[in-house]
Every structure is written in C-alpha cells, then in structure tokens.
Amino acid sequence: ETESTPDYLKNIQQQLEEYTKNFNTQVQNAFDSDKIKSEVNNFIESLGKILNTEKKEAPK
C-alpha cells in the first residue's frame, strides 16, 4: 500500500480549487443567480464524470 494520495483524489482536489477560483471571480464580477446555478451544475456534472471514470478505472 502506498501512502501517496490516489490520483482521483488529486483530480477532485484540483477540480475543487479551480471551481472555487472561478466561482469567487464570478461572484466578484456580478452576483447573477442564474449564472451561479449554471456553474454549480457544471461543477457537479464534471465532478460526477471524474468519480464515474475513477470507479471504472479503479483496481478491484
């Protein structure tokens, strides 16, 4: 067993960091609830894709 963080967790962490940066920028630019909803949905969708991909690729 390795002590390093699994790649899929690193991917999720990067995705969260990226999303947070983008989200903060958008909130500063304009508080547009439709835009924020859209961004949240996009984020959830992309996170779901990462998780589904990792499940398929994860060693049994």
Swiss-Prot record:
Q: Give the top-rank taxon of the lineage listed in the UniProt record for this protein.
A: Eukaryota
Q: Output a single Gene Ontology CC term carried by this record.
A: extracellular space
| Cell compartment(s), UniProt | Secreted
Has keyword Secreted? yes
Ordered alphabetically, the record's keywords are:
Antibiotic, Antimicrobial, Fungicide, Immunity, Innate immunity, Secreted
Q: Which residues form the signal peptide?
A: none
Which one GO biological process term can you cite for this protein? killing of cells of another organism
| Factors inducing expression | By bacterial infection.
* Keyword Secreted included in the entry's annotation: yes
Q: What is its main location?
A: secreted
Question: Found in which tissues?
Answer: Hemolymph.
Function as written in the Swiss-Prot or TrEMBL entry: Antimicrobial protein. Has antibacterial activity against the Gram-positive bacteria M.luteus (MIC=86.6 uM), L.monocytogenes (MIC=86.6 uM), and S.lutea (MIC=86.6 uM). Lacks antibacterial activity against the Gram-positive bacteria B.circulans and S.aureus, and the Gram-negative bacteria E.coli D31, E.coli ATCC 25922, and S.typhimurium. Has antifungal activity against P.pastoris (MIC=86.6 uM) and P.stipitis (MIC=90.9 uM), but lacks antifungal activity against A.niger, C.albicans, C.albidus, C.fructus, C.wickerhamii, F.oxysporum, S.cerevisiae, S.pombe, T.harzianum, and Z.marxianus.
The name this protein carries in UniProt is Anionic antimicrobial peptide 2
Species in which this protein is naturally found: Galleria mellonella
Q: What is the lineage of its organism?
A: Eukaryota, Metazoa, Ecdysozoa, Arthropoda, Hexapoda
